[in-house]
């Protein structure tokens, strides 16, 4: 018998603990409900799009692998409940209202939707939630999300499987690097202009440079930018080094 091992095995049960995403944690603080939108939940554990819940077979496999460690909880015990868009995810509690409004004017009782992350929000905002639709989000990082008409047959390390807020299977390809290198070049042009006393609106600067790019050669004059400000898992680089080649 070892106290440390005993606490490790029973700590989740003793504390009523669970694990979740940032959206799920905020939702719990505001409503007291340990729930998660199916899209965000799919980033924590594989989802069965038929049941709109965690993949039961994979849950069983995990618990079987964890059994020798003697935990008195199963994985399902510590995962938040999965909800799809439109389902009741609880209401704002008095405690949650105080977190949002320290003046006390906001009242409790407001119904709250299932918590989702930015990926699910982007799919809904671009109306890309139906089968064979997709959207691209480009910023500091970039990813494409395609709603699948059938399950993938093989494992593709470049693809993460997530879901829409309504539980449809989605293939996501994500890259860490997108606009950081472009922003650095635009900042260089801005600094150049400022050095000559010219004050240029940043939005106008982007617009002019984007339109100027349309006048360039199809092969960009033989110029090539590797925008790896950080590592890139999809191409197996642990660290990034920006490179501009001629």
Positions of PLM-derived features:
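Conserved phosphate-donor
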Residues: 82
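Conserved acidic, metal-coordinating active-site core of Asp-based
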Residues: 76
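Active-site core segments that coordinate phosphate-bearing ligands/cofactors
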Residues: 1-39, 45-72, 86-246
């Amino acid at each position: 018998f070892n106290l440390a091992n005993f606490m490790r095995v029973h700590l989740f049960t003793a504390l009523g603990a669970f694990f979740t995403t940032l959206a799920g944690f905020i939702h719990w603080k505001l409503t007291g409900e340990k729930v998660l939108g199916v899209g965000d939940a799919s980033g924590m554990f594989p989802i069965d799009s038929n049941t709109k819940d965690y993949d039961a077979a994979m849950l069983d496999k995990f618990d079987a692998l964890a059994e020798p460690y003697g935990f008195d909880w199963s994985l399902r015990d510590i995962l938040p409940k999965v909800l799809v868009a439109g389902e009741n995810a609880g209401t704002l509690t008095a405690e949650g209202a105080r977190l949002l409004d320290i003046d006390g004017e906001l009242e409790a009782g407001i119904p709250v939707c299932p918590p989702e992350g930015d990926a699910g929000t982007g799919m809904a905002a671009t109306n890309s939630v139906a089968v064979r639709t997709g959207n691209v989000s480009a910023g500091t990082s970039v990813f494409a999300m395609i709603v699948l008409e059938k399950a993938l047959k093989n494992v593709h390390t470049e693809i993460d499987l997530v879901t829409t807020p309504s539980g449809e299977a989605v293939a996501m390809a994500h890259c860490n690097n997108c606009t950081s290198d472009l922003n650095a070049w635009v900042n260089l042009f801005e600094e150049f202009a400022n050095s000559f006393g010219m004050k240029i609106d940043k939005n106008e600067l982007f617009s002019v440079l984007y339109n100027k790019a349309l006048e360039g050669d199809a092969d960009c004059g033989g110029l090539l930018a590797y925008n790896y400000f950080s590592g890139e898992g999809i191409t197996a680089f642990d660290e990034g080094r920006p490179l501009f080649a001629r």
